[in-house]
């Protein structure tokens, strides 16, 4: 009818109007003949066929075929090995067939929906107790020790400095400048290494 999509055919053609059409297809369905007609490939003024070799019609058919739904077709891997790779730690291939580069991104196969459901069910029955990272615990303990050491050394020196019991945060500007210099030196050393 038109080269672009038409929502209301009544905008272009009214019932009873005479139009030029081209027969583009004929099918038998349930003892009936289905006839496909096209107004696009015929000049409506003269009735001349604009697509005598049916090139435009074939292109449209190809476009329609490409939009078919392929969700029912599942990609299946035929031979998945029941092994674990020594290089990357992923299942399904040997180390000699592994393409992973050292320090590269690791990829593994996505489990089927059925396997995910089974894993979810087993996870509901068995809820493991979360274990904390031991390195985090060590870091926290070291931090607490340093904090305690600072408090004890500060409290010793602050008793002699102030009579009210409160310790002074910054005793002098000279010590503050010295700390900044030390920090800068440490910072520079880190970048050089």
Swiss-Prot record:
Example GO biological process: RNA stabilization
| Biased composition range(s): Basic residues | 134-150, 178-193
Output compositional bias ranges, type Basic and acidic residues: 118-129, 163-177
What residues does the S1 motif domain cover?
1-40
Instruction: Give the sites modified to Phosphoserine.
Output: 66, 135
**Span of the signal peptide:** none
Positions of modified residues (N6-acetyllysine): 96
Q: What sections of the sequence does the record tag as coiled-coil? A: none
The main place the protein resides is: nucleus
Q: Where is this region: Disordered?
A: 113-193
Instruction: Please tell me one Gene Ontology term that the record gives under cellular component.
Output: ribonucleoprotein complex
* Keywords for the protein's UniProt record, in alphabetical order: Acetylation, Metal-binding, Nucleus, Phosphoprotein, Ribonucleoprotein, Zinc, Zinc-finger
Which molecular function terms from Gene Ontology are attached? RNA binding; zinc ion binding
Cell compartment(s), UniProt: Nucleus, Nucleolus
Specify the residue ranges making up the CCHC-type zinc fingers: 83-100
Assembly mode = May interact with PNN. May associate with the 60 S ribosomal subunit.
Task: Please state what the protein is called.
Answer: Zinc finger CCHC domain-containing protein 17
Per the UniProt record, the source organism is Macaca fascicularis
């Amino acid at each position: 009818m038109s080269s672009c999509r038409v929502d209301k055919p009544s905008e272009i053609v009214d019932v009873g109007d005479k139009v030029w059409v081209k027969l583009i297809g004929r099918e038998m369905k349930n003892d009936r003949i289905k006839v496909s007609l096209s107004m696009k490939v015929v000049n409506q003024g003269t009735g001349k066929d604009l697509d005598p070799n049916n090139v435009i019609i074939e292109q449209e058919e190809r476009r329609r075929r490409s939009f078919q739904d392929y969700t029912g077709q599942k990609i299946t891997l035929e031979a998945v090995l029941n092994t674990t790779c020594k290089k990357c730690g992923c299942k399904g291939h040997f180390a000699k067939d592994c393409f992973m580069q050292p320090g590269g991104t690791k990829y593994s196969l996505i489990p089927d929906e059925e396997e995910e459901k089974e894993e979810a069910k087993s996870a509901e029955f068995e809820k493991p107790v979360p274990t904390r990272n031991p390195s985090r615990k060590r870091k926290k303990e070291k931090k607490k020790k340093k904090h305690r050491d600072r408090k004890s050394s500060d409290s010793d020196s602050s008793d002699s400095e102030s009579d009210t019991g409160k310790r002074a945060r910054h005793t002098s500007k000279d010590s503050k400048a010295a700390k900044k210099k030390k920090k800068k030196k440490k910072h520079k050393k880190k970048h050089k290494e």
